[in-house]
């Protein structure tokens, strides 16, 4: 079985799977049971009826258990094969005959896939498919070398991702990215800019020609590195590698718009944990997320000001109190709403805005986020925990008078206090919520064993 595909358009999750089917009553399940199993598979998938003793060496992704009633030898053999399992009757609904099998499989540390109703089985199979697709995927992080603490964190996180998910974090130096970009001439940059204006941006916006050429070169450099590594997402450390060096240079942030339009996962600040979170959310939801800073501030007191410079500590405390009172958090990043994928944008294209007031020489993509139900999440630094919340983006606030926070949006949560008590970091991923969480929850909780 091949690993998850990697294309020029980001994660490819619709990969074939191999499923086994076993019976506790016969060497081969009856045709009616096989038909029930096949009804949940796609063309290209493999379904093979095997003896329980053959499970461990068959290269299977999951097992359908049929014709089981009460206690049997099956749980021990399925657990030994380390395969996620579900029980299936011809009616494709839950039967109490399955209870003893599930109970013993759990006791042996095995994985029981949800299968109460046909829609639960379908979601479980989708989760297994996404789990298979994740194996072998790569994500690219550009980080300035020299920070020993962060290097150690990235190495530990990368090992955990390989072991738990089969996902590889490829870490390169930001100096390499800049050197790659320098190899592209003005002609190549201008050709790329022409495509951007035709497909991605409304126009050059607030950036000057030289800055735009630099941004195009950085885009071409990232595309080159993505192609070489086979990575499906990228996160350059745009601050430490470009902005806060002795002589600041053009940040790669404008390039993120074309990259997400291409289909890649993208996040800022070399945040590997965030990039993997985005990948997991896309695998479980089928929708691409964005990333943003979250705040318990910048609410009504801030919105009433004529200038961000008038914001006092007392006002910020009042806004913090408001967040806990009405269970909302504020999102903003680089003076915009973040790197929104096209499906999360109100407009068909990005604008180019200067990152005022903090970095007047830099520019960032800007778009208006769509409102509606969302999933908010972040993976822990050991890749063993995930903070996952369901909420609703229900308001926006824009205006140049708000400076660094001129592109705010607000998410209503079930309980802001509980969110703060578990909060992992200032960066969180936000994805559109399709309303059905079964595949996501099965992938994260049952298959990847994230707590």
Give the role of each language-model region.
Residues 39-46, 51-62, 198-219, 423:
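Metal-dependent C-N hydrolase catalytic cores
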Residues 2-46:
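N-terminal basic/disordered segments at the start of proteins
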Residues 18-30, 65-69, 89-91, 142-146, ...:
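Structural motif
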Residues 103-287:
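Conserved, well-structured core segments that form the ligand-binding/active-site neighborhood
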């Amino acid at each position: 079985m091949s690993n998850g595909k990697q294309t020029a358009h980001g994660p490819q999750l619709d990969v074939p799977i191999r499923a086994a089917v076993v019976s506790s009553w016969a060497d081969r399940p009856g045709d009616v049971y096989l038909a029930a199993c096949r009804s949940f598979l796609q063309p290209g998938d493999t379904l093979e009826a095997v003896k329980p003793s053959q499970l461990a060496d068959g290269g299977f992704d999951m097992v359908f258990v049929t014709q089981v009633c009460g206690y049997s030898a099956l749980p021990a053999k399925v657990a030994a094969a380390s395969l996620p399992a579900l029980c299936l009757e011809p009616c494709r609904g839950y039967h109490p005959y399955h209870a003893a099998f599930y109970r013993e499989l759990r006791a042996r540390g095995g994985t029981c896939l949800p299968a109460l109703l046909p829609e639960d089985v379908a979601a479980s199979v989708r989760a297994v498919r996404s789990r298979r697709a994740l194996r072998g995927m790569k994500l690219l992080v550009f980080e300035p070398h020299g920070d020993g603490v962060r290097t150690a964190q990235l190495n530990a996180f990368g090992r955990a991702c390989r072991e738990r998910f089969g996902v590889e974090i490829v870490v390169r130096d930001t100096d390499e990215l800049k050197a790659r970009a320098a190899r592209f001439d003005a002609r190549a940059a201008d050709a790329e800019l022409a495509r951007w204006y035709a497909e991605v941006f409304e126009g050059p916006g607030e950036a000057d020609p030289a800055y735009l050429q630099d941004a195009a070169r950085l885009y071409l450099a990232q595309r080159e590195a993505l192609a070489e590594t086979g990575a499906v997402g990228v996160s350059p450390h745009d601050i430490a590698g470009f902005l806060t060096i002795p002589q600041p240079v053009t940040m790669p942030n404008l390039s993120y718009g074309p990259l997400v339009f291409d289909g890649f996962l993208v996040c800022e600040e070399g945040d590997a944990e965030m990039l993997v979170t985005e990948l997991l959310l896309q695998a479980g939801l089928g929708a691409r997320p964005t990333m943003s800073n979250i705040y318990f501030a910048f609410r009504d007191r801030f919105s009433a000001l004529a200038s961000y410079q008038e914001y006092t500590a007392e006002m910020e405390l009042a806004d913090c109190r408001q967040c806990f009172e009405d269970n909302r958090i504020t999102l903003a990043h680089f003076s915009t709403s973040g790197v929104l994928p096209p499906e999360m944008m109100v407009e068909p294209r990005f604008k180019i805005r200067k990152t005022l007031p903090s970095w007047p020489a830099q520019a960032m993509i800007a778009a208006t986020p769509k409102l509606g139900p969302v999933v908010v999440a972040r993976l822990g630094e050991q890749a063993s925990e995930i903070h996952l919340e369901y909420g609703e983006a229900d308001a926006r606030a824009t205006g140049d008078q708000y400076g660094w926070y001129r592109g705010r949006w607000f998410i209503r949560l079930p309980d802001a206090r509980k969110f703060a008590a578990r909060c992992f970091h200032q960066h969180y991923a936000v994805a559109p919520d399709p309303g059905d969480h079964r595949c996501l929850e099965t992938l994260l909780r049952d298959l990847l064993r994230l707590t």
